């Protein structure tokens, strides 16, 4: 289903709330906008609106196995099936770094007095 909604610019906040609350489904979504601040605000307000979210691009053509893909809300569990991101649901990620040549000076070079 494709929904296109034309709105009055003075009702932008109301329109974004309508977009975010109208549907119980959220497979993909997109916004087309030219102002960076509007893009930033809209993306933030629609964080949970769709599993895949596109900015100034068509909301189709995700390649399973190459691009994480999965819906949110009634469109799925947002697991991103077909990608390694799906594994994150089943594991507890831990990053370990080992340095084989420990530094002798623990000060950051940018903190040196000139």
Q: Language-model features: where?
A:
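Conserved C-terminal structural/oligomerization subdomain of aldehyde/semialdehyde dehydrogenase
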Residues: 1-114
């Amino acid at each position: 289903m494709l929904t296109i909604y034309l709105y009055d610019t003075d009702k932008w906040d109301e329109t974004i709330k309508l977009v975010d609350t109208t549907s119980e489904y959220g497979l993909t979504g997109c916004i087309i906008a030219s102002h960076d601040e509007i893009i930033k605000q809209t993306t933030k307000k629609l964080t949970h609106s769709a599993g895949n979210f596109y900015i100034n691009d068509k909301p189709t053509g995700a390649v399973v196995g190459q691009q994480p893909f999965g819906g949110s809300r009634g469109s799925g569990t947002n697991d991103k099936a077909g990608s390694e991101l799906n594994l994150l649901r089943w594991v507890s990620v831990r990053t370990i770094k080992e340095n084989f040549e420990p530094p002798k000076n623990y000060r950051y070079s940018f903190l040196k007095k000139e």
